[in-house]
Amino acid sequence: MAHEFLHLVWHPGWGLSSQSLMLIWPRRLLVAVYYEGFMPRTRWLVMRLSPLVGLTVLPTLVLLVIYPCEVSFFWQQFIVLVILVNSLGAGGDLVASVIVARQVASGGQVGNWNGRAYWRAEKAIGSEAA
């Protein structure tokens, strides 16, 4: 749930837009977020990678910093569990980010429209406004 929340807050409108949806499907043990529309490539990359940074990289750094201090075994193991579970869940985010970083120009936009993922170049964005 925290993983998806970190995606959600990086949607345009900080996840409060009518274009942002959170899907909770208990029967399939699925929690997901979806944004119907486009966002700049950089924002999309930040949105995709924020759970990896927030729930894997930062907790790892915290463990390294507090390691010499007296921290209970329970909390150390809890943080390690969060890191491991999130690392597995963020694998798809990492792959998608590499694909977008390689294929979409820096001025482009990435998004979903009618349930399908698309990207569009900067020139296409400018021609729509005209």
Cite the ranges covered by each PLM segment.
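Metalloprotease/metallohydrolase-associated module, dominated by Zn2+-dependent proteases
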Residues: 27-122, 130
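Small-residue-rich helix-interface/hinge motifs
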Residues: 4-38
